[in-house]
Protein backbone atom coordinates (compact mmCIF):
# COMPACT_ATOMS: atom_id res chain seq x y z
CA UNK A 1 0.00 0.00 0.00
CA UNK A 2 1.25 3.48 -0.85
CA UNK A 3 2.27 5.83 1.93
CA UNK A 4 -0.03 8.78 2.58
CA UNK A 5 1.39 12.24 1.83
CA UNK A 6 0.89 14.54 4.82
CA UNK A 7 2.49 17.72 3.42
CA UNK A 8 4.18 19.13 0.34
CA UNK A 9 6.82 21.76 1.10
CA UNK A 10 8.27 24.01 -1.59
CA UNK A 11 11.60 25.74 -0.95
CA UNK A 12 14.13 27.60 -3.12
CA UNK A 13 17.62 26.88 -1.80
CA UNK A 14 21.17 27.60 -2.92
CA UNK A 15 22.65 24.51 -4.56
CA UNK A 16 24.95 22.54 -2.29
CA UNK A 17 24.40 24.93 0.63
CA UNK A 18 21.29 23.66 2.43
CA UNK A 19 21.68 23.75 6.21
CA UNK A 20 19.33 23.31 9.20
CA UNK A 21 19.07 27.08 9.72
CA UNK A 22 15.93 28.90 8.52
CA UNK A 23 14.19 28.48 6.11
CA UNK A 24 14.97 24.72 5.96
CA UNK A 25 14.85 23.87 9.67
CA UNK A 26 11.47 25.37 10.61
CA UNK A 27 9.76 24.23 7.39
CA UNK A 28 10.81 20.60 7.80
CA UNK A 29 10.91 20.51 11.61
CA UNK A 30 7.20 21.18 12.02
CA UNK A 31 6.48 18.04 9.99
CA UNK A 32 8.97 15.91 11.94
CA UNK A 33 11.34 15.32 9.03
CA UNK A 34 15.01 14.45 9.67
CA UNK A 35 16.48 17.82 8.67
CA UNK A 36 20.13 16.75 8.48
CA UNK A 37 19.27 13.80 6.25
CA UNK A 38 17.42 16.13 3.85
CA UNK A 39 20.30 18.64 3.85
CA UNK A 40 22.89 15.94 3.07
CA UNK A 41 20.81 14.45 0.23
CA UNK A 42 19.95 17.87 -1.26
CA UNK A 43 23.57 19.06 -1.09
CA UNK A 44 24.80 15.82 -2.69
CA UNK A 45 22.32 16.08 -5.60
CA UNK A 46 22.97 19.78 -6.24
CA UNK A 47 26.76 19.91 -5.67
CA UNK A 48 27.43 20.21 -9.42
CA UNK A 49 25.19 23.29 -9.74
CA UNK A 50 26.93 25.48 -7.14
CA UNK A 51 25.96 29.15 -7.20
CA UNK A 52 22.46 28.51 -8.56
CA UNK A 53 19.14 28.64 -6.72
CA UNK A 54 17.46 25.25 -7.12
CA UNK A 55 13.79 24.99 -6.10
CA UNK A 56 12.82 21.74 -4.41
CA UNK A 57 9.43 20.15 -3.73
CA UNK A 58 9.47 17.92 -0.65
CA UNK A 59 6.70 15.36 -0.07
CA UNK A 60 6.39 14.37 3.60
CA UNK A 61 4.66 11.07 4.40
CA UNK A 62 2.75 10.10 7.55
CA UNK A 63 5.64 7.92 8.79
CA UNK A 64 7.84 11.09 8.64
CA UNK A 65 9.84 9.82 5.68
CA UNK A 66 10.18 12.11 2.67
CA UNK A 67 11.02 12.31 -1.00
CA UNK A 68 11.98 15.39 -2.95
CA UNK A 69 12.00 16.53 -6.55
CA UNK A 70 14.47 19.12 -7.84
CA UNK A 71 13.09 21.74 -10.23
CA UNK A 72 14.98 23.87 -12.74
CA UNK A 73 16.46 27.18 -11.50
CA UNK A 74 14.11 30.20 -11.76
CA UNK A 75 14.16 31.93 -15.16
CA UNK A 76 15.14 35.22 -13.51
CA UNK A 77 18.30 33.65 -12.05
CA UNK A 78 19.28 32.16 -15.43
CA UNK A 79 18.57 35.47 -17.22
CA UNK A 80 20.62 37.48 -14.69
CA UNK A 81 23.52 35.05 -15.10
CA UNK A 82 23.36 35.24 -18.93
CA UNK A 83 23.14 39.06 -18.93
CA UNK A 84 25.87 39.28 -16.25
CA UNK A 85 23.84 41.65 -14.06
CA UNK A 86 23.44 41.60 -10.28
CA UNK A 87 19.69 42.32 -10.28
CA UNK A 88 16.86 43.36 -12.58
CA UNK A 89 15.78 46.96 -13.20
CA UNK A 90 13.53 48.68 -10.68
CA UNK A 91 11.90 50.52 -13.62
CA UNK A 92 11.90 47.92 -16.43
CA UNK A 93 9.87 50.08 -18.85
CA UNK A 94 12.23 53.05 -18.58
CA UNK A 95 15.63 51.78 -17.50
CA UNK A 96 17.23 48.76 -19.21
CA UNK A 97 20.00 47.08 -17.23
CA UNK A 98 21.35 44.59 -19.76
CA UNK A 99 20.67 42.39 -22.75
CA UNK A 100 20.81 38.76 -23.85
CA UNK A 101 20.99 37.25 -27.32
CA UNK A 102 18.39 35.02 -28.97
CA UNK A 103 20.81 32.09 -28.59
CA UNK A 104 21.06 32.69 -24.83
CA UNK A 105 17.26 33.02 -24.66
CA UNK A 106 16.85 29.69 -26.44
CA UNK A 107 19.36 28.03 -24.10
CA UNK A 108 17.47 29.31 -21.02
CA UNK A 109 14.13 28.23 -22.52
CA UNK A 110 15.56 24.76 -23.22
CA UNK A 111 16.68 24.50 -19.58
CA UNK A 112 13.29 25.66 -18.27
CA UNK A 113 11.13 23.63 -20.70
CA UNK A 114 10.35 20.72 -18.30
CA UNK A 115 8.94 23.11 -15.66
CA UNK A 116 7.16 25.55 -17.98
CA UNK A 117 3.57 25.28 -19.13
CA UNK A 118 4.72 25.19 -22.77
CA UNK A 119 4.52 22.53 -25.47
CA UNK A 120 7.47 23.57 -27.61
CA UNK A 121 10.66 25.61 -27.48
CA UNK A 122 9.10 28.66 -29.20
CA UNK A 123 6.39 29.00 -26.54
CA UNK A 124 9.02 28.56 -23.82
CA UNK A 125 11.16 31.28 -25.45
CA UNK A 126 8.18 33.69 -25.36
CA UNK A 127 7.64 32.99 -21.65
CA UNK A 128 11.33 33.55 -20.84
CA UNK A 129 11.44 36.68 -23.05
CA UNK A 130 8.49 38.08 -21.06
CA UNK A 131 10.36 37.46 -17.82
CA UNK A 132 13.44 39.20 -19.25
CA UNK A 133 11.34 42.18 -20.36
CA UNK A 134 9.86 42.50 -16.86
CA UNK A 135 13.40 42.55 -15.46
CA UNK A 136 14.51 45.39 -17.77
CA UNK A 137 16.67 43.11 -19.91
CA UNK A 138 16.36 43.34 -23.70
CA UNK A 139 16.60 40.42 -26.13
CA UNK A 140 18.82 41.12 -29.15
CA UNK A 141 18.90 39.18 -32.42
Swiss-Prot record:
Belongs to the universal ribosomal protein uL11 family. One of its GO terms (molecular function) is large ribosomal subunit rRNA binding. Gene3D superfamilies: Ribosomal protein L11, C-terminal domain, Ribosomal protein L11/L12, N-terminal domain. One of its GO terms (biological process) is translation. NCBIfam families: L11_bact. Part of the ribosomal stalk of the 50S ribosomal subunit. Interacts with L10 and the large rRNA to form the base of the stalk. L10 forms an elongated spine to which L12 dimers bind in a sequential fashion forming a multimeric L10(L12)X complex. It holds the Pfam family Ribosomal_L11. Keywords: Methylation, Ribonucleoprotein, Ribosomal protein, RNA-binding, rRNA-binding. Forms part of the ribosomal stalk which helps the ribosome interact with GTP-bound translation factors. This is Large ribosomal subunit protein uL11. It comes from Nostoc punctiforme (strain ATCC 29133 / PCC 73102). One or more lysine residues are methylated. GO terms for cellular component: cytosolic large ribosomal subunit. HAMAP family: Ribosomal_uL11.
Amino acid sequence: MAKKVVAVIKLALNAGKANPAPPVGPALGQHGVNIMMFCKEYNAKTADQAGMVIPVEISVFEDRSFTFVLKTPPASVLIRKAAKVEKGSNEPNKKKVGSITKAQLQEIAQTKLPDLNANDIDAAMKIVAGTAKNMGITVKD
